[in-house]
């Protein structure tokens, strides 16, 4: 399974040092997680970084009313992380839940920080990941500020149509800021 991660590194980093790639791979161990497993509990400090080899997960938080608000659905070849907790070293409300049988490569954050101090390839890889996350989040932010629920749904339809077929619509509704009933109406209008 580390072959998938190694391929991912080579796609994301131009001419990575093979020694540095091996160092990166060495801090990760493979873990099989069942549907419903929690990779990171809410209101905790993240202790590990994951790379989703196959399967899927979602990040969510619970609002003041007790409703789960899905932030994102993460699919294979992506990192599992809570950037708020990683960046601040503090507790964050984000929960990372596994949505189906998944294989995750896991590294303890102590080893991640240590490797980031000395491995240029890993630095580039993580910088690229954070840059990509920032772009996605900014696009979503602008859509929430300027767009309608219908436009947010259309964006998911265009960028991640498999999400609509594969996962409960309550997650999608939550991601675009509507109720499941409102999402049904939007879908019927299409």
Label each region the model flagged.
Residues 147-190:
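Phosphate-/nucleic-acid-contacting segments
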Residues 29, 56-61, 79, 103-104:
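Short beta-strand segments in beta-sandwich/barrel cores
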Residues 39-44:
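Short phosphate-coordinating micro-motif centered on Lys-Gly-acidic
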Residues 34, 53-54, 75, 100:
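A cytosolic small-molecule/anion-sensing beta-strand core signal
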Residues 1-29, 85:
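Cyclic nucleotide-binding regulatory module and flanking cytosolic helices
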Residues 47-58, 76-77:
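Glycine- and acidic-residue-biased ligand/ion/polar-headgroup-sensing regions
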Residues 70-127:
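Cyclic-nucleotide recognition modules
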Residues 6, 133-142:
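Short, Lys/Arg-enriched N-terminal segment that forms or immediately precedes the first helix
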């Amino acid at each position: 399974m580390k072959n998938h991660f190694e391929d991912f590194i080579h796609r994301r980093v131009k001419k990575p040092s093979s020694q540095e790639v091996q160092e990166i791979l060495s801090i990760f161990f493979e873990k099989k997680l069942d549907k419903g497993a929690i990779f990171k509990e809410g209101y905790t400090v993240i202790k590990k970084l994951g790379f989703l080899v196959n399967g899927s997960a979602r990040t969510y938080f619970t609002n003041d009313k007790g409703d789960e608000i899905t932030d994102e659905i993460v699919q294979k070849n992506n990192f599992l992380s809570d950037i708020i907790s990683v960046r601040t070293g503090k507790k964050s409300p984000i929960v990372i839940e596994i949505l189906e049988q998944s294989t995750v490569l896991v590294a303890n954050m102590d080893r991640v920080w240590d490797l980031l101090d000395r491995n240029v390839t890993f630095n580039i890889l993580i910088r690229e990941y954070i840059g990509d996350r920032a772009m996605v989040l900014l696009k979503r932010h602008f859509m929430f500020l300027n767009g309608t629920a219908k436009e947010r749904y259309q964006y998911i339809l265009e960028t991640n149509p498999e999400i609509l077929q594969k996962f409960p619509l309550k997650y999608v509704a939550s991601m675009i800021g509507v109720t499941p009933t409102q999402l049904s109406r939007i879908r019927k209008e299409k």
